[in-house]
C-alpha cells in the first residue's frame, strides 16, 4: 500500500503575490525535503513473530501463488493489483514547466499518487521513464500489466500522448487513461452542462470556439461532439483549424478537422470567436481579450483554463459581458480541477475489474459531477462542485462502475451503491 504523506514582476501591485509565491516556494521545498518525497511503502499486515513471517512470506505465500497460477483472475483477490494504478510519465509536458525530464517530473507524479489515495483510496505508484520513444513506452507499460490494475498516463507531450494511449488501449486489458486529456475534458463538459442550464441554451444549438489544440483541447472537442455539439471551431497558434489546412497540422488535428469547422472558416481567434456562445481556452495567458468577448453571443460562457494565468481574468470577462466564467485556478469560482474526475473514475473501474475506460464511462463521470450541483444551488459562481466536496468521488465511482457493467467491459458485477459506500470509507478527505 502506498501512503500519502521565472521572472517575477515586483511592481507595487504585485508585491503581495510575490510574497505569496516566495512563501509557497519555501514551504513546498521544505515539505518535500523534510519528508524526502510524499510517498512511502507501508505493510497492510504485521510481521512480529515466526507465524506472521510464515504467512506473509515462505512457506505460506506459496498458497496464493498456486491459486493465481491456476486462475490468473485471482490476482485481483490475493494481491495489490486490484487497487493499484501506475502513474506513468516521460516528463515531456509537465503543467506550467514543460519538458523537464523524468527526474524533475517525479514530484508531480508523487503528488498525483497522493491525490488518488486521498480522494478515492486508490493506491498509486509513480513511474518516470527515461525515454521519449513511443515504442519503448508502450512496451514498458505492457510489461507492467501483471502488477497494475490500471495506468494513468501523465504529462506526456502531444502527439505522442495520443499514440501511446491508443496503442495501450488496444494492446492491454486494463484501464488506460490519459488524465491531461480526459480528466480535463470530463470536468469541463460537466461545468458546461450546468452553465447551459443557467443561460437557457442547448448543446445542439451552441457555437463553441476552443483555443489550444494540445491534449486537453482535442479531448474536450471530442467529448463535446459526443454530447451533440456540432458547431465547433478549434484554433491553434496558426489560427482556425480546418480540413485541408496546408500548415501546422498533424494526424490528430487532421482527424478533428473532419468534423469541426464545417464551413472551413479561416482566420485568427479574434475572427472566429465572433458570435460564439462558448469559449474554451487551454492555451496561454491573455489569448482572449475583452474586445473578443464583446463580439461573442449574449450570455457567453468562458472557460479560461491556462495556468497559472488564464486566457482572460474572470472579472474582465464578466465586465465584457460573459455570463459564466470558469478557470483552472482555486482562487476563482468554478475551478476546473481534474481531481473531480480521475480518483472516482479509477475507483469505479478498479472495483469492477474493468478492461478499459470507454466513452460511456467518461460520459457517466460527466453526469455524476454535473448532477452534484443542485438546481436550487446553481448560479454563475457555482456550476462545478468544489474539489474537496466529499460527495464527488463516491458518485463518480458508482456511475462509472455502472457504465462499465452496462457496456460489457466489467469482469465483475458489483452494486454501484456498494462502490459509492466503499469509496466514502476509503477516501481520506471528508473525515472528521
Residue ranges and their predicted role:
Residues 253-323, 329-331:
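Rossmann-like adenosine-cofactor binding region
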Residues 126, 152-155, 176-179, 210, ...:
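General beta-strand structural signal in soluble alpha/beta enzymes
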Residues 76-81, 117-118, 143-145, 169-170, ...:
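Solvent-exposed alpha-helices and their adjacent loops that cap or buttress functional pockets
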Residues 95, 100-120, 178, 182, ...:
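Glycine-rich phosphate/diphosphate-binding loop of Rossmann-like nucleotide-binding domains
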Residues 90-92, 100, 129-130, 155-158, ...:
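Short, ordered loop/turn segments at secondary-structure junctions
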Residues 179-180, 199, 304-414:
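Adenosine-phosphate binding glycine-rich loop
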Amino acid at each position: 500500500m502506498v501512503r500519502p504523506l521565472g521572472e517575477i514582476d515586483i511592481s507595487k501591485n504585485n508585491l503581495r503575490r510575490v510574497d505569496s509565491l516566495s512563501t509557497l516556494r519555501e514551504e513546498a521545498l521544505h515539505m518535500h525535503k523534510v519528508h524526502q518525497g510524499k510517498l512511502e511503502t507501508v505493510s497492510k499486515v504485521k510481521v512480529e513473530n515466526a507465524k506472521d513471517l510464515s504467512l506473509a512470506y515462505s512457506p505460506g505465500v506459496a498458497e496464493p501463488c498456486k491459486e493465481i497460477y491456476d486462475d490468473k483472475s485471482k490476482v485481483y483477490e490475493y494481491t495489490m493489483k486490484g487497487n493499484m494504478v501506475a502513474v506513468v510519465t516521460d516528463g515531456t509536458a509537465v503543467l506550467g514547466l514543460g519538458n523537464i525530464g523524468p527526474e524533475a517530473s517525479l514530484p508531480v507524479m508523487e503528488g498525483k499518487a497522493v491525490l488518488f489515495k486521498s480522494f478515492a483510496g486508490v493506491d498509486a505508484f509513480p513511474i518516470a521513464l527515461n525515454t521519449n520513444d513511443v515504442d519503448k513506452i508502450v512496451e514498458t507499460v505492457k510489461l507492467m500489466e501483471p502488477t497494475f490494475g490500471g495506468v494513468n498516463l501523465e504529462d506526456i507531450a502531444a502527439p505522442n500522448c495520443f499514440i501511446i494511449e491508443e496503442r495501450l488501449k488496444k494492446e492491454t486489458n486494463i484501464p488506460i487513461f490519459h488524465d491531461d486529456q480526459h480528466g480535463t475534458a470530463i470536468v469541463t463538459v460537466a461545468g458546461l452542462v450546468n452553465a447551459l442550464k443557467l443561460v437557457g441554451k442547448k448543446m445542439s444549438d451552441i457555437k463553441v470556439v476552443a483555443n489550444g489544440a494540445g491534449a486537453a483541447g482535442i479531448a474536450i472537442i471530442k467529448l463535446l461532439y459526443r454530447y451533440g455539439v456540432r458547431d465547433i471551431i478549434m484554433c491553434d497558434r496558426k489560427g482556425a483549424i480546418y480540413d485541408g489546412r496546408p500548415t501546422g497540422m498533424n494526424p490528430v488535428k487532421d482527424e478533428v478537422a473532419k468534423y469541426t469547422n464545417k464551413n472551413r472558416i479561416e482566420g485568427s481567434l479574434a475572427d472566429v470567436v465572433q458570435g460564439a456562445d462558448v469559449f474554451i481556452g487551454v492555451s496561454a495567458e491573455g489569448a482572449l481579450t475583452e474586445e473578443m468577448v464583446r463580439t461573442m453571443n449574449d450570455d457567453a460562457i468562458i472557460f479560461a483554463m491556462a495556468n497559472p494565468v488564464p486566457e482572460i481574468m474572470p472579472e474582465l470577462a464578466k465586465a465584457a459581458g460573459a455570463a459564466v466564467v470558469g478557470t483552472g485556478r482555486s482562487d476563482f469560482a468554478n475551478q476546473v480541477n481534474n481531481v473531480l474526475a480521475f480518483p472516482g473514475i479509477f475507483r469505479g473501474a478498479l472495483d469492477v475489474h474493468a478492461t478499459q475506460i470507454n466513452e460511456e464511462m467518461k460520459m457517466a463521470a460527466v453526469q455524476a459531477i454535473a448532477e452534484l450541483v443542485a438546481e436550487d444551488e446553481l448560479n454563475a459562481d457555482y456550476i462545478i462542485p468544489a474539489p474537496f466536496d466529499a460527495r464527488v468521488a463516491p458518485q463518480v465511482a458508482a456511475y462509472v462502475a455502472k457504465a462499465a457493467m452496462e457496456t460489457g467491459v466489467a469482469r465483475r458485477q458489483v452494486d454501484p451503491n456498494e462502490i459509492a459506500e466503499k469509496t466514502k470509507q476509503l477516501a481520506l478527505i471528508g473525515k472528521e
